[in-house]
């Protein structure tokens, strides 16, 4: 990393990994939008997709990143020797490695909330399937405690990674995106045929799948895309869907990372546009939740 003066800053970040260690970038407590009840959400770092509308750009890279918050900088130049010497906390690590034992201890601090609300733990990302072996072992441990488990995934991985993990879950929040295979490949770098094959597999195996569809102007906010999604879901006897309207909440994160967000000037969907998508899904017999 370089300072504002263009000088190289040492970050002392070691990128070694072990099978019993995950790389995460956040643990969010008291979430009400990522499964039933009060959830503790573990965000895994690393994603194979390049969604232009991504609200968590810090999740894309699998590496630990170091960013500088200009408002906290004292301009003391101590960081030119080592970013860890920053006295004001202007430098921030995005991502950390955590062991199975440590993560188990961390989430079980919230067990009382899980039990009183019917909630539990949700694994999100990034894309949790990029660390599927760890995630599977972790959920196996939580199951021994009787904790409700869920994952949020785009399902774009070999079934051998997805299915064992999904079978440990009370809910799989399955993120659909662009429903045209060519556009999904070109825009998002997604293997849509594999995604849909995995969706059908999960349903056939009795997994509780809850599809989620972002409503993104210019990409997924269209009657055509919605109809393509419904054409997949209805034959599977899926009876609910979450619609997630586009928002600008991620824009400050792009600035923090020194990136330009191509969606910066894109407005949120109008209430009429959201209502149209909702009506299409409801006419098809789906129970609709807007916002997750």
UniProtKB/Swiss-Prot annotation:
The cellular location(s) given in this protein's UniProt record come to: Cytoplasm
* Source taxon at top rank: Bacteria
User: Which prosthetic group or cofactor does it need?
Assistant: [4Fe-4S] cluster
* A cellular component annotation (GO) from this entry: cytoplasm
Q: What is its EC number?
A: 1.97.1.4
Chain residues that bind S-adenosyl-L-methionine: 53-55, 126, 175-177, 247
Q: Which Pfam families match?
A: Fer4_12 (PF13353), Radical_SAM (PF04055)
Please state every residue range assigned to the domain named Radical SAM core: 33-287
Enzyme's top EC category:
oxidoreductase
**MF annotations from Gene Ontology:** 4 iron, 4 sulfur cluster binding; [formate-C-acetyltransferase]-activating enzyme activity; metal ion binding
Catalytic reactions of this protein: glycyl-[formate C-acetyltransferase] + reduced [flavodoxin] + S-adenosyl-L-methionine = glycin-2-yl radical-[formate C-acetyltransferase] + semiquinone [flavodoxin] + 5'-deoxyadenosine + L-methionine + H(+)
Query: Where is coiled-coil annotated?
Result: none
Q: How is the cofactor bound?
A: Binds 1 [4Fe-4S] cluster. The cluster is coordinated with 3 cysteines and an exchangeable S-adenosyl-L-methionine.
Write the record's keywords in alphabetical order, separated by commas: 4Fe-4S, Carbohydrate metabolism, Cytoplasm, Glucose metabolism, Iron, Iron-sulfur, Metal-binding, Oxidoreductase, S-adenosyl-L-methionine
For this protein, the record's Gene3D superfamilies field holds: Aldolase class I
The chain positions of domain 4Fe-4S ferredoxin-type read 62-96
The primary site where this protein sits is: cytoplasm
| Family according to the record | Belongs to the organic radical-activating enzymes family.
Q: What does the record give as the function of this protein?
A: Activation of pyruvate formate-lyase 2 under anaerobic conditions by generation of an organic free radical, using S-adenosylmethionine and reduced flavodoxin as cosubstrates to produce 5'-deoxy-adenosine.
The record's annotation in NCBIfam families points to:
PRK10076.1 (NF007483)
Q: What is this protein called?
A: Pyruvate formate-lyase 2-activating enzyme
Q: Per the UniProt entry, what species is this protein from, by scientific name?
A: Escherichia coli (strain K12)
